Regions:
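Helix N-cap at the start of a conserved alpha-helix in ABC-type nucleotide-binding domains
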Residues: 40, 161-163
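Conserved ABC transporter NBD signature motif
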Residues: 51, 57-68, 72-73
Length: 196
């Protein structure tokens, strides 16, 4: 079985926090939970995988060095970070216009199909979305270019149980569609992982 992510002794030191010798793999066809309380280093680990945070150690994605082959790798990754998204003054339709130029594999039909499935309006500004609607839009945007790997940082935090379960079902379906796909999901809600 191939690994879509491999970490070996990844470390990052801050003034008041240290991530020390983190090692794990995310095999193809699997959803792997990165579990820990707030402040445990989950986001730092994810940002190290994505090369947003420069860390020591070895990170391989699809068997390739995450620093040397970053642009090739990122084309195949869908990411949902809590602190990253486009302007609240955009609509879903405008996000489509931007993303189709960002990703070579952007699938317009899939994006609008997901918006319909999630019951998201295409012409309403994001600032007027609920937190659950915003998360669904982030997920639709992350999935619409058919990535091989999803990396999700606390995607269900602060959502009501019904929306949370709906989003978790989306992740399960994403994996079931293609056995070479993987998800790395950080959470402090262990029942989320039990659900999927």
């Amino acid at each position: 079985m191939k690994n879509n992510i491999e970490l070996q002794n990844v470390s990052k030191k801050y003034k008041d926090f240290e991530l020390k010798n983190v090692s794990f793999c995310v095999p193809e066809g699997c959803i792997v939970g990165l579990i820990g309380e707030n402040g445990a280093g989950k986001t730092t680990t994810i940002k190290s995988i994505l090369n947003i945070t420069k860390a020591d150690g070895v990170v391989k994605i699809f068997g390739k060095d995450n620093k040397k082959e970053e642009s090739k790798i990122k084309e195949q990754i869908g990411v949902v970070l809590d602190d990253s998204f486009l302007s609240d003054y955009l609509t879903a339709k405008q996000i489509h216009s931007i993303m189709k130029d960002v990703y070579k594999t952007w699938d317009e039909n899939k994006f609008f199909q997901l918006l319909k499935q999630f019951q998201l309006p295409t012409d309403k500004m994001i600032k007027d979305f609920s937190s659950g609607m915003k998360m669904k839009l982030k997920i639709a945007t992350a999935i619409a270019h058919n990535p091989k790997l999803l990396i999700l940082d606390e995607p269900t935090s602060g959502l009501d149980p019904v929306v949370r379960n709906e989003i978790l079902d989306i992740f399960r379906n994403y994996i079931e569609e293609d056995e070479t796909r993987s998800i790395l999901l950080s959470t402090h809600i262990t029942t989320d992982l039990e659900h999927i």
